Amino acid sequence: MANRIAAILPAAGFGTRMGADTPKQFLELDGVPLVQFTLRRLAECAEITDFFIPTHAEEAEALRARLKGQSTGRPVRVLTGGNSRQDSVAAALTEVPRDAELILVHDAVRPLVKREQVERVIAEARACGAAILGVPALDTVKEVKRASLPGDVALITATIPRERVVLAQTPQVFHAALLLEAFARARQEGITASDEAGLVEHLGHDVHVVLGSDRNLKITRPGDMELARFYLEQERASQGAAGGKR
């Protein structure tokens, strides 16, 4: 299939910072688990041809059953993830079709991404090989070391100019061969990174940043769910107002 784009939604995290018994990807937004809501959002991008969701082995069957009632019009495969994000994405990469042109990775707990953002980062990755969404850092950023002081106290070692800093978001999109090479190199050299762009950077390949949005938040702490609900209400109110003007 020409221009095939495979999307991976890592959903095997434990969400310890949320302080909830339920893994955060299964907390509900608008009456459905976050992972399902996020899948719906990504499916608004017609360019994506395949979806892969690595999750906990004990949650996989329940998620498959839940998704049976949701039609994306494209294949959705739930598979067993790993102990880390990197392991989960690696597991999904073994299932990605060999003829995929691009591979997109998006946090299952980043539910409010917009179709336009997805399309822009796909277009940039298609042109340059690797692109992610990101937002400028608004606060002053300090480099610190923590080992020298007790408790939660850290020592500042440098101030990083804000104009040199962006906060990485997802989707992160790559030429398929490039991402597969990055994961193969990481496996060979024992390299770990907190996102896919970090592994591609390790190859020496440039990664472009497309402007994202603060509303494309990652659900990490308890207050994030309240904020996501508020943003969703605002989004729907705005859509309703726009519809009323037609």
Language-model segments: residues:
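SAM-dependent methyltransferases
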Residues: 1-8, 12, 40, 44, ...
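N-terminal glycine-rich phosphate-binding loop and ensuing alpha1 helix
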Residues: 2-60, 76
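Residue-level signal for inorganic ion chemistry
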Residues: 9, 35, 92, 106-107, ...
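Hydrophobic C-terminal alpha-helix "anchor/cap" residues
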Residues: 39-43, 67, 96
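Acidic helix N-cap motif at the loop->helix transition within catalytic regions
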Residues: 61-66
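Conserved donor nucleotide-binding strand/loop of the catalytic core
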Residues: 71-83
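Active-site nucleotide-sugar/metal-binding loop of Leloir-type enzymes
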Residues: 87-102
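Conserved core of the sugar-phosphate nucleotidyltransferase
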Residues: 112-210, 245-246
